[in-house]
Design a protein with these regions (language model features):
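Short, well-structured alpha-helical interface segments that form or flank functional binding sites
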Residues: 37, 101, 119, 123, ...
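Terminal substrate-recognition subdomain of acyl/acetyltransferases
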Residues: 1-34, 140-271
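Amphipathic alpha-helical segments that form well-ordered structural scaffolds
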Residues: 41, 45, 127, 168-172
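A conserved beta-strand-loop-helix scaffold within acyl/acetyltransferase catalytic domains
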Residues: 28, 32-33, 39-113, 135
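Conserved acetyl-CoA-binding loop-helix of GNAT-fold acetyltransferases
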Residues: 111, 116-139
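Short loop segments at secondary-structure junctions
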Residues: 82-83, 114-115, 213-217
């Protein structure tokens, strides 16, 4: 596994103040297996933050995802200062079905309160580019093949301050959201299958897609075809952990998306 390369050019346009952060006191460990000695530590931090909100996968799910390295690259990155927790994130890189771009699903990102507003968050948003490039190399992609980072984010509400802070941070960094007035993206139902069946069937949840199209951050529209590729990649990442019937829900059908030639606005995430 390659070492992480901290290249300032990988930082999002609005994250360049992160260049001044001294990273030398920090250790960045990449985790690619549930058998990694650091997995339980990293997973524990993520579960404590996101598990109670039903926003974190079970160990068994992640173990299966780790084992699909030939199809997708899932990893965690744990950041520590000596033995002190500083940050942790996880993400998955996968090639689009047509091979035109590497797509990285940004899953979870947790920075300790003492490390916030130091510039570290900017690097945590940029680190998945290393995984994307490894994915491109693994699939022998042509030089210059595009990379897109994509996150599923809840819609902004006035009563959820932490959500608004998170959206504002991505907005300042230069991420944009695909206009939800035209693209109605839904995340599959993550509940236990027994619970899904007891409740009468899956209930996909609405999310907005927030993206960083690396090298194209200045563009303010995205095509229907590219939008569909992004959503398909997310569903391809999820598919091994879901029953086919649950993924066949009408709200997850990509036929609902705008036609390939349509141009969809890229908006500020808080809008």
């Amino acid at each position: 596994m390659a070492q992480i390369v901290f290249s300032p050019s990988d930082l999002a346009p609005g994250d360049h103040r992160s260049k001044s952060l001294d990273l030398s006191p920090l250790t960045f460990d990449r985790i690619r297996s549930t058998r990694d000695p650091l997995f339980e530590l990293a997973y524990g931090y993520l579960w404590k933050e996101f598990g109670a909100k039903d926003e974190m996968e079970l160990r068994e799910t992640l173990d299966r995802r780790f084992q699909l390295a030939s199809q997708m690259r899932y990893e965690m990155i744990l950041v520590r200062r000596h033995d002190e927790f500083v940050a942790v994130r996880d993400h998955t890189a996968i090639m689009s079905r047509d091979g035109t771009q590497a797509i990285v699903h940004l899953s979870h990102n947790l920075v300790a309160p003492a490390a916030r507003r130091t510039g570290l968050a900017g690097w945590m948003r940029a680190l998945p580019l290393t995984t994307a490039r490894e994915c491109l190399k693994e699939h022998k992609a042509a030089p210059g093949t595009r990379i897109t980072l994509v996150a599923e984010m809840e819609y902004p509400t006035d009563d959820d301050h932490s959500r608004l802070i998170r959206l504002k941070a991505y907005e300042r960094a230069g991420f944009r959201k695909i206009d939800p007035a035209f693209v109605h993206y839904f995340q599959p139902d993550f509940r236990d299958p027994v619970e899904i069946d007891k409740s009468g069937g899956p209930v996909p949840l609405p999310f907005q897609l927030v993206v960083r199209r690396v090298g194209r951050e200045h563009e303010r529209v995205i095509s229907g075809a590219e939008t569909r590729r992004l959503a398909q990649a997310l569903y391809d990442i999820y598919s091994p952990q879901f029953r086919p019937g649950d993924l066949a829900h009408p709200l997850l059908a990509l036929e609902r998306y705008p036609q390939d030639t349509a141009l969809i606005h890229l908006l500020p995430p808080t809008q």
